[in-house]
Amino acid sequence: MEPVHAIELRHITKRFGKVVANDGIDLAINRGEILSLLGENGSGKTTLMNMLSGIYLPDEGEILADGKPVTIRSPKDAFAHGIGMIHQHYKLVEVFTAAENIALGLKGKEHDRKAVAAQVQAISDKYGFGIDPNKKVYDMSVSEKQTVEIVKVLYRGAEILILDEPTAVLTPQETERLFNILRAMKADGKAIVIITHKLHEVMALSDKVAVLRKGKYIGTVNTCDTNPQKLTEMMVGHAVTLNIDRPQAKYKDLRLEVKGLNCRNGEGLPVLKDISFQAFGGEILGIAGIAGSGQKELLEAIAGLQKADSGHIFYYPPHPESDIAGHHVPVDKAGEELVGKTPGQIRKVGVSLAFVPEDRLGMGLVGGMGMVDNMMLKTYKDTPGPLVDRKTPKALAEKLIDELEIVTPGVATPVRRLSGGNVQKVLVGREIASTPTVLMTAYPVRGLDINSSYTIYRLLNEQKMKEVAVLLVGEDLDVLLELCDRILVLCGGQVSGIVDGPTATKEQVGLLMTHVGGGKEGEDRA
């Protein structure tokens, strides 16, 4: 007699118009097991799990819970079958306590404040969450908010938990704590599904790995019988080199210097406190920190988008007689002050600065425009005369489609119709094509599949070797440690340390992300 699976998907198909997101997928989820769900962007991972959690209905196929066919039309139906999903973007009311958020929408005396707090405490003690039921959400760290989301689905009786990119904004220490909690739930007989791009986490945590490719089910393997290389080949269908290079540029001239920078947000609260560092052409300077530590504000201040209360940002242009071919003249010592200048004024004084913001469509691109018009946003003011050059940006758009493998019906298709990963490729490609001397990019591979991610790493290294100063805000510490020459760590809007990329460890950077002080500040260079 075959074992009964907690959840079994049979021949599941889901279409959105002419696009087949899931094509006849079969998948089994078992109790007491952690299953990682892998696949490139657009492979259908989240769509498949959204059908389990009641957000979508399958067009074809059936879902079995404990061997019996079920219909899941809503998240309420999903909970009735013991299925709970923790999404990447948390759905909590900031002014409510943990207990109030967990009980939100539930009726009856058994869900009054005192009863909920007691049950939340019991769940917390059982799995080691360490949650305070009476703590307000706005006082919580990112990992605490995630904990509340997990407890919320457990409180509603979930036996099958689905987590979408659960470690995206966690420190290494918080990630290990989450893994210990998931292992405890697995030991208690829960079935757990993890959607992730991080292969090292797949290998460290999961029992089995299921792989999707272009909406089709490729197979499920035991984690102990595979490795990152094999999993990557299953995802993309061909061999892929997973090495991240760290080439060394011949020259490293001072390109950017930040001194005592202080900034406030729109509510008048300090977001950057006495920030000082240097960035050099021919290096990649990583910027690490938990979410909300000031990464976004720092890049925006340098770009002229965030007003500075005090401090200085000096730009040092390459010597005009230097060239990529190898002729090098040391940088002029007189720096150009950027504080107080708008982005337009920064451009007018000759600062060649490219910025890939975190908010792609809100700040970086115009969603209603096609690729050609979005390319022109960077250059249309440079065209002399009344007529705007469209041939050059069209040629650039076609070149980027080819080089970055951007999936789009055409260069005139509004970019908002593209997948998130393809939108990122458009923005990164445009900024790199502007031949900057300073390239700032925030989370350039967020949402990208592994093939596209390694393409972006290669492009960043190419800019570095052209003596561009690259500032890279990232969330994957493994990548930052492999790719960056130095890593600046922010904590609470302050520089908690600047470490050497080749010699630093995840644990060292993780501690600096949560503690100000103890790191090596300043700009000591060999």
Residue locations for each model-derived region?
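Glycine-rich phosphate-binding loops of nucleotide-dependent enzymes
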Residues: 2-526
